[in-house]
Amino acid sequence: MQKLSEVYRGKAKTVYATENPDFLVLEFRNDTSALDGKRIEQFYRKGIINNQFNHFIMLKLEEAGIPTQLERLLSENELLVKKLDMFPLESVIRNRAAGSLEKRLALQEGLLLDPPIYDLFLKNDSLHDPIVTESYCETFGWASTAHLVKMKELSYKVNDVLSPLFDAADLILVDFKLEFGLFKGEVILGDEFSPDGCRIWDKTTLNKLDKDRFRQNLGGLIEAYEEVAKRIGVPLN
């Protein structure tokens, strides 16, 4: 399918229109950002790794009956996807305490959360993506009650599918964010699933193998992404 004009340029991906109004092309770039996009650096091969990683994960979720925007892989850094009407929200599943939750509640990093916590955040860089409740979403029209229920249900189902996958590779899926949208009235998983949007630790050493390596200036970002991909079976070119 032919890639046409640029529709949107995000922090790490560019979205293009196609001749079919129901489909878009996602191009994964080498950009890596932190601090709500204020800090941006480029890492060689990152776009390729994240595209292949995301494609692999979305296939796993589709196989488990979770609807995603995935259509097919187009190139090493491009993906054909359904065009969704996105909710302005991030759904976050937390299996361990880390990041903003750890700071907000003064928790010990790595504390096991049983059952896992589900959070909602409003996608707004200028407001630093504030945490919101379902009541806020309904009042301000960001999502209906039925759609919120479905997003939460699918988020936990994603966790049920992916946590064992990472566990079998001696990795801990600490937390992750998801974004959903509507395609012909159905709630569908959109955006991406890659080490950019989740926390992954080595089960034995608790070494961080995700974007926190960039946020915390730990170094070795691409090596960490490749390590995770290799362990879970992502076929990297």
From Swiss-Prot:
Its EC number is 6.3.2.6. Signal peptide: none annotated. It comes from Hamiltonella defensa subsp. Acyrthosiphon pisum (strain 5AT). HAMAP family: SAICAR_synth (MF_00137). This is Phosphoribosylaminoimidazole-succinocarboxamide synthase. It catalyses: 5-amino-1-(5-phospho-D-ribosyl)imidazole-4-carboxylate + L-aspartate + ATP = (2S)-2-[5-amino-1-(5-phospho-beta-D-ribosyl)imidazole-4-carboxamido]succinate + ADP + phosphate + 2 H(+). It is an enzyme of class 6 (ligase). Pathway: Purine metabolism; IMP biosynthesis via de novo pathway; 5-amino-1-(5-phospho-D-ribosyl)imidazole-4-carboxamide from 5-amino-1-(5-phospho-D-ribosyl)imidazole-4-carboxylate: step 1/2. InterPro entries: SAICAR_synt/ADE2_N, SAICAR_synt_PurC, SAICAR_synth, SAICAR_synthetase, SAICAR_synthetase_CS. GO terms for molecular function: ATP binding; phosphoribosylaminoimidazolesuccinocarboxamide synthase activity. The keyword Protein transport does not apply. Pfam families: SAICAR_synt.
